Regions:
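Class II aminoacyl-tRNA synthetase catalytic cores and aaRS-like
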Residues: 1-594
Length: 594
């Protein structure tokens, strides 16, 4: 038996293999002893097949089958036979056949696992992460990783067919603390100095364009030391792309083609020839987010003019201070319980809103609301007309400065859609969000900061305002959004390729010439040697595969992810290191009590 090599995968056997002699290897998913007859569900990467072990065919090896348990690793030599009509298992791809064992070899025993190795288990995620090598045996997790492999292969094939060259960029690079915090790596041979792990290959891919490579791509690991969410990891993977002698339309057309190719090849899904486009201003106005989920409606409605001048002092005071009033219309939800409404007040408070007003439209068209008494019949009629409200609808209002209204009402829109089942989980709603503001004002730092990246090119017509009014400058910046998740962009497709414009942008964000030279001098110098117009995009591979696999967290599509506290429960990383290692690096640790 030990001389026999595996010649088939478990999940590939079918009626066409009837009477075929096969050698299978895998893990025991389940064992059932029917007294003189043992059934084994044998699992490998391809799926599960039923193995039948009886003394007449297996001889002395029947005793081995009696001793095996779940997750034992075994090899089986046997013959495929058709199942009888009444024993066909429609839940298995191989359910029409079984393998009658002639020989059985135990390759390894196994302890009882801490959870069942099967799909749909209700197990604490930390336990799954601690025993990740067992969690990854589960078919759904293996499907996720195989989908990820298929996606990356399709990406590479597409890029190669469009004349792109895959080039690796450094992992140990220079710290340029603009944006998220860097992961720092101490240099042993340069005492007191540090490398940084790259947050993106941004600078290097621009230098490759200066170097004349023209079309670059890379599937690259990036690192950011930031607070984690369901769709964030300290180390993540992206498809990085850069092109020379292009404009934004060239980049968007090429990457739409890439995404169509990936979805068709990996999922068999045909996507539209052209994706929708909307400006950043429009996205914020209608959806309260620069990552709008377009699988449902419930757009934000500007109610400022409709309520202005009424007797409701709260709204009037906010409007007088430059604030706005917006609402969403939750169709058919006027019967919402008061307890749930009170909970929504707490929900919007998370996003900075100081309150939430509501109006329930009764069957007779009248308005039920604590604030209805502050509005005349004429005002109420105009409010209902502006909101396109009908009997049975619920209006939810937030009044504050525009940024708070957008954040609170945009989040409430998503929350109400989830609660009311308005989101079609099978729908794929792509859009480009274009024309981002170049800068946003940081109240904390009392200066403008780049909304995404200081290397983004401003629109040509806005360049003169870099020195006079940076807040009015828009960027040649574009994000691809799918179902409310940014999957491509980083909002920096078109880069600055002129030294004078780059200097003006650094000046606008408060970087002195000396600071800019210290951080980016090598790149600024390169711009003086004939940098071509260039631009690109980065696709978040983890997020993209998460959506394609219909998962809720990118941890489900990464083989060995970190927890939300950036730790690896399986390897116990990060960990303490020996004092000797620290001395070699010329550093010491000082723990600061919080």
């Amino acid at each position: 038996m030990s001389n026999l090599k595996r010649n088939h995968y478990c999940g590939t056997l079918a009626k066409a293999d009837n009477e075929k002699e096969v050698v299978l290897c895998g893990w025991v998913a389940k064992r059932r002893d029917h007294g003189g007859l043992i059934f084994i569900d044998l699992r490998d990467r391809s799926g599960i097949v039923q193995v039948v072990v009886d003394p007449d065919h297996a001889g002395e090896d029947f005793a081995k089958a009696e001793a095996i348990r779940s997750e034992y690793v075994i090899k089986v030599h046997g013959v495929v036979r058709l199942r009888s009509e009444e024993t066909i298992n429609p839940n298995l791809a191989t359910g029409e056949v079984e393998v009658v064992a002639k020989e059985l070899e135990v390759l390894n025993s196994a302890k009882t696992p801490p959870f069942y190795i099967q799909d749909g288990i209700d197990v604490d995620e930390n336990l799954r992460l601690k025993y990740r090598y067992l969690d990854l045996r589960r078919p759904e997790m293996q499907r996720n990783l195989m989908l990820r492999h298929k996606v990356t292969k399709l990406m590479r094939d597409y890029m190669d067919n469009h004349d792109f060259c895959e080039i690796e960029t450094p992992m140990l690079t220079k710290s340029t603390p603009e944006g998220a915090r860097d992961y720092l790596v101490p240099s042993r041979v340069n005492p007191g100095k540090f490398y940084a792990l790259p947050q993106s290959p941004q600078i290097f891919k621009q230098l490759l364009m200066v170097a004349g490579m023209e079309r670059y791509f890379q599937i690259v690991r990036c690192f950011r030391d930031e607070d984690l969410r369901a769709d964030r990891q300290p180390e993540f993977t992206q498809l990085d792309i850069e092109m020379s002698f292009v404009d934004a339309d060239d980049i968007m057309d090429m990457t739409e083609g890439l995404i169509r190719h990936v979805f068709k090849g990996a999922l068999g899904v045909d996507l539209p020839e052209k994706f929708q486009r909307m400006t950043w201003d429009e996205a914020m106005d209608k959806y309260g987010s620069d990552k709008p989920d377009l699988r449902f409606g419930m757009e934000l409605i500007n109610m400022t003019e409709a309520v202005k001048g009424s007797e409701f002092k709260v709204f009037n005071d906010i409007i007088d201070k430059g604030g706005i009033v917006k609402a969403i219309n939750v169709k058919g939800d006027a019967g919402i319980p008061r307890r749930e409404l009170d909970g929504l007040v707490n929900f919007v408070a998370i996003y900075g809103a100081k309150g939430l007003a509501w109006m329930q439209i009764q069957p007779d068209g009248s308005v039920k609301s604590p604030i209805a008494k502050f509005f005349s019949e004429e005002y109420l009629a105009n409010i209902l007309k502006t909101a396109e409200a009908e009997p049975g609808d619920l209006l939810l209002f937030v009044a504050d400065k525009p940024s708070v209204v957008a954040a609170a009402l945009g989040a409430l829109r998503i929350e109400m859609a989830k609660r009311r089942g308005l989101i079609d989980e099978n729908k794929l709603a792509f859009t480009w969000v274009v024309d981002f503001p170049m800068f946003e004002y940081s109240e904390e730092e009392k200066r403008y900061v780049a909304m995404h990246h200081p290397f983004t090119s401003p629109r040509e017509e806005d360049i003169p305002q870099l020195a006079t009014d940076p807040g009015k400058v828009y960027a040649k910046a574009y994000d691809m959004v799918l179902n409310g998740t940014e999957i491509g962009g980083g909002a920096v497709p078109i880069r600055i390729h002129r030294r004078d414009v780059q200097d003006a942008v650094f000046h606008a964000i408060g970087l002195s010439e000396e600071q800019a030279q210290e951080k980016f001098g090598f790149m600024m110098g390169a711009f003086e040697y004939g940098a071509p117009p260039h631009g690109g995009l980065a696709f978040g591979l983890d997020r993209l595969v998460m959506i394609m696999a219909k998962r809720d967290s990118i941890r489900d599509v990464i083989a060995f992810p970190k927890t939300q506290s950036a730790s690896d429960l399986m390897c116990q990383a990060p960990n303490d290191v020996e004092e000797k290692q620290l001395r070699e690096l010329h550093i010491r640790t000082v723990l600061v009590k919080k």
